[in-house]
Amino acid sequence: MAMTMHVDIVSAEGEIFSGQAELVVAPGQEGEVGIAARHAPFLSPLKPGEVRVKSEGQEPLSFYVSGGMLEVQPYLVTILSETAVRAKDIDEAAAQEAKRAAEEALADRSGRMEYAKAQAQLAEAVAQLRTLENYRKGRA
C-alpha cells in the first residue's frame, strides 16, 4: 500500500475536493510541481492550469484552477484558488468565447491595463481548454 496524504482543493465557492491521494501535480509559477506524501513543506503561487490528483486504485482526477496558492505539508496539500472546477464540469463553449474575446482585446491594444487584463484572460481560457482536452484524452 502506497503512502498517501490528505488533499484539499478549495475555491471561493467552497470545497471542490477533499480526500486521500498518492500524488498531486499542480501548475506552479515556475512549472509543474509533483507532490507525494512526506514532501518537504513549502508555499507556492499557482498559475492558471490543470491540477491532477492520483489516488491508489482509482482513475486520476483533473481540475482547472485559475491560479492561487499551493501549501504543502508532509501529509497535507491545500490548494486555494479563486476558481476551481472539475475538468468534466468545464463549459467548453464559454471557454472558447472567453478565448475569442481575449484575443480580440489583445488585437485592440488600446491601453496597457486592458492589454495585461486581456493577456490574463487569454491564459485562463487556454488553460481551461487544455485541462478539458487532457481530461478527454484520459491523461487526467
From Swiss-Prot:
State the membrane topology. Peripheral membrane protein
Q: Does the keyword Ion transport apply?
A: yes
Tell me which Pfam families the record gives: ATP-synt_DE, ATP-synt_DE_N
Q: Which SUPFAM superfamilies match?
A: Epsilon subunit of F1F0-ATP synthase C-terminal domain, Epsilon subunit of F1F0-ATP synthase N-terminal domain
The alphabetical list of record keywords is: ATP synthesis, Cell inner membrane, Cell membrane, CF(1), Hydrogen ion transport, Ion transport, Membrane, Transport
Q: Which Gene3D superfamilies match?
A: ATP synthase delta/epsilon subunit, C-terminal domain, F0F1 ATP synthase delta/epsilon subunit, N-terminal
The terms under GO molecular function for this entry are: ATP binding; proton-transporting ATP synthase activity, rotational mechanism
Q: Does the keyword Membrane apply?
A: yes
Q: Which CDD domains would you find in this protein's record?
A: F1-ATPase_delta (cd12152)
- What stretch or stretches form a coiled coil here? none
Superkingdom, according to UniProt? Bacteria
User: What family is this protein classified in?
Assistant: Belongs to the ATPase epsilon chain family.
> Self-association or partners: how does it assemble?
F-type ATPases have 2 components, CF(1) - the catalytic core - and CF(0) - the membrane proton channel. CF(1) has five subunits: alpha(3), beta(3), gamma(1), delta(1), epsilon(1). CF(0) has three main subunits: a, b and c.
The name this protein carries in UniProt is: ATP synthase epsilon chain 1
The protein's organism comes out as Methylococcus capsulatus (strain ATCC 33009 / NCIMB 11132 / Bath)
Write the lineage as a comma-separated list: Bacteria, Pseudomonadati, Pseudomonadota, Gammaproteobacteria, Methylococcales
Q: What gene does this protein come from?
A: atpC1
